[in-house]
């Protein structure tokens, strides 16, 4: 799988799901359609450290492919987490984020011939939400 290029996305909507959980909708204006497979993730490059590789934070895509250029992230505020603190305190509607993806292989098989069980906790539901809504 080829490494995806870094892209710019604009936050077009933010929803406080709970006191420490937010949904962020990100539009990729340079693309007519943002393609991904349910279960994949994006990596954000956040300005939280001077070393590049310490700025990267990966989050599963919570939305499902709908043919648009918008995707959704479901993020919980982690105590002491630099990335989530930045997202919760600095990012507003209209903010620009740098990201890479979609990437990852935690996806459904091409053909499902048996019942599948999806087990998770907390915001670990994000990739499963994408999968279930896609099915």
Task: Please report, for each region that a protein language model flagged, where it lies by residue.
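FNR/FR-type flavoprotein reductase catalytic core
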Residues: 2-5, 51, 80-135
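Ferredoxin-reductase
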Residues: 2-95
């Amino acid at each position: 799988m080829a490494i995806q290029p870094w892209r710019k996305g604009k936050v077009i909507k933010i929803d406080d799901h709970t006191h420490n959980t937010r949904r962020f909708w990100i539009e990729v204006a340079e693309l007519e359609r943002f393609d991904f497979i349910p279960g994949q993730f994006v990596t954000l490059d956040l300005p939280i450290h001077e070393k590049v590789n310490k700025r990267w934070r990966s989050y599963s895509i919570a939305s499902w492919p709908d043919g648009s250029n918008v995707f959704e992230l479901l993020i919980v505020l982690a105590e002491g987490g630099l990335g989530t603190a930045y997202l919760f305190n600095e990012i507003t509607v209209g903010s620009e984020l740098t990201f890479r993806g979609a990437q990852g292989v935690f996806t459904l098989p091409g053909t499902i011939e048996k019942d599948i069980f999806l087990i998770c906790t907390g915001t670990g539901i994000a990739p499963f939400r994408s999968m279930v809504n896609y099915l």
